[in-house]
């Protein structure tokens, strides 16, 4: 266990009081679940979360007081109760050390040292954190993500009775009545044998309403093609009236608005951090893609349904948002040359498949996304924003969250060059240039 934790967190953490703690001591204490709390002292929601999380942490750990108290480990025993095997580590986005110190001072858990900014960025990228506050739970032995939305855990299970909050099968979470907009009620068992789109959306969200209009047409085309497909709307509306108004535009099913517990469990199951989000499942309830929104917008005729992920994507207006999700390899080509984009995809696909398979075997997301970028206004804007040369072909890795780029400017790009470039990046052998 200690090897994984040291690789993830480094050798030292600090307490709120500034004392150093050896990471390997967490293994000695029998920690089974690790919470990573991503936040910042300047964020009011983070301040609110810290207060509720301190009470939650105290209750689960059995500390003397359900709030800030002595350093982690207080009250630990040789064979702690399972819920005491929880530890939390704060990962800060603060840019001012004094503000960071003031914020962590009263935290009863551990924190990544302020100086570990590079490690902070690695954690953001590894777990695809897109906003703060965020709280995720990991199996402390394997590193596998147990729960991506710890904020809902604190709200829904304040006593920690469901510890360690591992994922449950979709069939179990969705079990219960589902509605159609005409008032008809169906049991979730009616989904048997169908691909399912789980659609997290809300009427107050303009991008959601835009996607819904497109999705209605996609749903119709898929059904007319004879595919067994159903969509389940999971509302984030702020009132039942808004839910009803929005749902009236939809030809598919919905979790009843009044069933807040089931809606929350679905959000927890898929770690939803923003809307609109469309998760596409196979008939066994396993995730095919979390990028249903991008797929629907890119595939007007739904010919690629059910949209199994492609190792290499062609960069477009609709999928460019994925550049912000973590490091991305982007191969820029001269698309005026017929077949250049397809040849570029074939060039980098073998290494993309190898990386994806390697991390899938570890039940982890791949640390890189892979794109080919042709010549268009969006690509020109990306080159301008990242201050890249006009050369083509041009092999790059862009890390927007770290505001860093890595450029391999050579006359000829071969599979061996691509693989060496990727491996050197993953081994942290490349020197970044600022974006």
Curated annotation (Swiss-Prot):
Places the protein is found: Cytoplasm, Cytosol; Nucleus
InterPro entries, alphabetized: NRX_PDI_b (IPR041861), Thioredoxin-like_fold (IPR012336), Thioredoxin-like_sf (IPR036249), Thioredoxin_domain (IPR013766), TryX_NRX_thioredoxin_dom (IPR045870)
Domain Thioredoxin: 167-321
A GO term, aspect molecular function: thioredoxin-disulfide reductase (NADPH) activity
Pfam family, one: Thioredoxin_6
Record-level GO BP terms: cell differentiation; circulatory system development; in utero embryonic development; negative regulation of protein ubiquitination; negative regulation of Wnt signaling pathway; Wnt signaling pathway
EC id: 1.8.1.8
Catalysed reaction, written as an equation: [protein]-dithiol + NAD(+) = [protein]-disulfide + NADH + H(+); [protein]-dithiol + NADP(+) = [protein]-disulfide + NADPH + H(+)
Sites of N-acetylserine modification: 2
Keywords associated with the record: Acetylation, Cytoplasm, Developmental protein, Differentiation, NAD, Nucleus, Oxidoreductase, Wnt signaling pathway
GO CC field: cytosol; nucleus
Its biological purpose: Functions as a redox-dependent negative regulator of the Wnt signaling pathway, possibly by preventing ubiquitination of DVL3 by the BCR(KLHL12) complex. May also function as a transcriptional regulator act as a regulator of protein phosphatase 2A (PP2A).
Family: Belongs to the nucleoredoxin family.
Complex formation: Associates with the phosphatase 2A holoenzyme. Interacts with PPP2CA; the interaction is direct. Interacts with DVL1 (via PDZ domain); the interaction is direct and regulated by oxidative stress.
Protein name, UniProt field: Nucleoredoxin
The organism of origin for this protein: Bos taurus (Bovine)
Designated gene of the protein: NXN
